[in-house]
C-alpha cells in the first residue's frame, strides 16, 4: 500500500475536504485498510493567481519546499487540492523524485471518457490565464468555455470574498449564478475548476453533470495507493 502526500493549504478548507473524500472513497471495512496519508497544510504559500497576474510573490519556492518535505516524510506520490497551483506542476516535478499526479490531467481523461465536447469552467482568473485546462483538455478534443470578464469577477468574488473568507452563502450564490449562465450557453458539463467551487456547488444544483476534479483526484489517489 502506498502513502499519499497532500500538498495543501491552498486553501485549508479545500485540503480538509480532499482528505475527507479520500477516506469516504476508500473501500475499507476497518481502519487498517485505509492508506496512510501525509498532509502538509502550508497556508503560507503565496497566492497563485496573484503571481500569475503579475501582482504577487512567486509561490514556486514554497510549493517546492513543501513537496520536498512530503517526500522526506515518506509520501510515495503527491496530489494538490489547488487547480491554480497546477500551473507550476512541472517545476515541482523537476525538484522531487516522487511523482505528482495532476488533478487537471486526470479530469481531462475523465471528461473524455464521458464523451463531452464542451466543458464550462469555473476557476480562478489565474487558472484561466495560465491555460492549464485548455492545454490538457485540447489533447482530448474538449473545448473549454469560460465566463466573460464581468462574469469572472463574480466567480472571483465567490471564491475569495465567499468561500475563502468563510461566507459560504455568498460563495454559493455567485458561483451557482455563473454556472447556470455557462449551462445556458451550451456547456455539456461544468468543471468545478477551483477547489472552493466544489465546497459549495453540488450536482443537484445543475441540469448538466458537475465534474469535480477533487472527486476525480481522490478516486485516482485511492486507486494508486491501494494497488498491490
From Swiss-Prot:
Catalytic activity of the protein: L-aspartate = D-aspartate
Official protein name in the record: Aspartate racemase
Active-site residues annotated for this sequence: 82 (proton donor/acceptor), 194 (proton donor/acceptor)
Binding residues annotated for substrate, in chain numbering: 47-49, 83-85, 164
Activity regulation (UniProt): Weakly inhibited by citrate, but not by asparagine.
GO MF entries: aspartate racemase activity
Assembly information from the UniProt record: Homodimer. The existence of the interchain disulfide bond seen in the crystal structures is uncertain, but disulfide bonds have been reported for cytoplasmic proteins from thermophiles.
UniProt-reported outcome of changing residue 82 to A: Abolishes racemase activity
EC assignment: 5.1.1.13
Keywords associated with the record: Disulfide bond, Isomerase
